[in-house]
Amino acid sequence: MIDHNNIIIGNSINSKTFSLIESVKNGKLKECIGYLEKIRLQNPSLDLGEIINSGDDCGNTALHWACYKKWYDIVKYLLSMGADPNIANTDELQTPFQWACIGGDLHIVKYVLNNGGDPHLQDKRGYNSLIHATQYNEISVVRYLLDKGGVNVDSPDFLQKTSLHWAAYQGHTQLLLFLVNKGADINALDSLGRSPLHWAAFKGNSDPIKALCDFGSKTMEKDSNNQSPSDICSSQNHNYLAHFIKTFNYHPFRKVGPLLYNIFWIIFAILLQLYFGFIFYHFTLIPALILFGASLTCCKLFIEPITLSNSPNPLLPTWMITSFTVSFVYYVRYVVPAFPNIILTHTITLFVYSSYYYCAFKLFFSDPGTVSSSTTSQDSKDFINAVEKELEIPEVCSTCLINKPIRAKHCRTCKRCVARFDHHCAWINNCVGVNNNLLFIILLCLFSLAYIISVTFNFKLMSIDENSPLYSEGKMEWWTYHYSTYKGLILFTIYKSFIMAWLARLLYVQITGVINNVTMFELMKPPKGSKKKCCNHAPQDQNNNNNNNNTTTNNSSSSSSSNNNSTGTNNDNNNNNNLGTSSNESGQSNCNIDQHNDHDGQSSEPLLNEVSIQIRSENGVEEDDDDENNKNPSNKSFNKNSRDLDPTQTNFRDSILIPKRTNNNENPYDKGSRENIREFLYDTSKWFRTTTFSNKNF
């Protein structure tokens, strides 16, 4: 025991005279230096390392807090003064390096690792640094630990849960994809005999479930309670997901090749359009509309179950080409014979139609700007180099494992990264990116021009009918005559007018996007907020502990009672999500979590703590180890609201309305209309390059 002017008592710090940890929490480097230098000058023989490595009431040292609070300069100073990066706290046996991984500052993780931090150490639950980073959705830290730290991607905790189990349980889809593509075992079983798919099913995380099924996870695997993932979904009232898992391997098109799949949808689209044409042509308007609505409902019920999600589908492109072909055949069959003398106009019209076909088919099969995935190993080296030299960290594609260039986006439908991603267009069954965006705009212009020509000649054709009543003599008589005489022509014109109204809006967005240098994806995606941490790990002052203990204990009781989830068996205990703190044997309260809102700086209510499950060896019952007061549980909560998935394919409502930009920040790519247009036309190669790394300011 060291007792130097009451600075240290045992292994804890006397808060009346010692201010190092509080100074570190507040990021006051000068106070830290001044305090330690004062002690050095007053007591040259005193071991400063022992002071620095002394902990608070929970055993957290100054380096713990500096790593978690992301005070990079303080971390460097403490390590230079002899701070131990592998000293475990008394509460959870977690090291400063593990707190650095939780904090998420990759440069701090790098620095602590290079100064002796051990990424393989485990806390009292068996969580190593990789599992901690996974729980907090720190994909860059996970990538660094795998590429540089040498951590095994399948390293388990004491309950045999791997990082993939935790990513599936937490709903971190992008991180899950990254781990699988880095070689994680999708069928690894924990002590309950559960795979990652079981835990994704337990929480009802739809995107991880679909991703794991696509990767080939065993959907019928039984756990120690004889429950499959679909059984667990059913017990948690996730009935849709239970049906999805149960029928995944029995999908009618999942085992056939893409050729038969595409042929089916092409034939179906042609027959469906002919059927709708037959309805409107042979029935009067009201019965036709009723039959049309009923047919659409049947199609929806039929199409959705047999459509492969996130897979290219030629249904809409075939529909578009068929519609245009009908218009072209009508023009050649009726318009050209009716107006044989305007040869130049017919020539221009045929050129427009043929150009449209050329552009459409080229868009169907063209490369929108795929970012090559053949540089994965080099990208990994570039990533490590950026971290080691403290440059800007490149963003990784969790599927392609490449450093994504700026404005690039991975399309889940096309399964590739697209440079300067604009959107995935279901009507061309392809992405719109840097290579084909101009061609896409030309296609819209050609369709608009063909529509104007078609409508003009349609009305001219009706006007030369000698039996037609004059419009001035009666509007109703005029419309009745032409609807009965030219029923197909009028219905098709109305149909094309609806399409043209939407395409005009789309063309407007595309042109203004070029002028303002903004893509449709950037217009439609939600604004990115500041990155939030799910908990602060900050113990409150000792004076506040007694006041807050009763409140947090009451919150814990109510939360536990309202958040119990059961898998529906006697061997599966309830999973209790506990809030706040518990009391230890001495009657003193444990370190409470001081939650902060990163957006406005105001304190918020603590988040629900996730469960760490252990098995009772004597009876095999699943138990929440946080329920027992004497175990001094960690007050850790994880980020449960994953914001990983940005849509790559717009829904029908967004396609029609195309909302205005929701991000109020200035567009960083807008250089003025003239420069934007020049860049769009000529400077396309820049979007294939990874962001030019710059020095990071700390």
Swiss-Prot record:
Transmembrane segments: 263-283, 286-306, 312-332, 334-354, 439-459, 489-509
Compositional bias segments (type: Low complexity): 543-584, 631-640
UniProt main location, coarse: membrane
Gene3D superfamilies, sorted: Ankyrin repeat-containing domain
GO annotation, cellular component aspect: membrane
Domain DHHC stretches: 395-445
EC number per UniProt: 2.3.1.225
Localization, UniProt: Membrane
Top-level taxon in the UniProt lineage: Eukaryota
Alphabetized Pfam families for the sequence: Ank, Ank_2, DHHC
Root EC class: transferase
Record-linked SUPFAM superfamilies: Ankyrin repeat (SSF48403)
Spans of repeat ANK: 58-87, 92-121, 125-155, 159-188, 192-221
Active site positions: C425
Keywords (A to Z) from UniProt: Acyltransferase, ANK repeat, Glycoprotein, Lipoprotein, Membrane, Palmitate, Repeat, Transferase, Transmembrane, Transmembrane helix
Protein family per UniProt: Belongs to the DHHC palmitoyltransferase family.
Designated name of the protein: Putative ZDHHC-type palmitoyltransferase 6
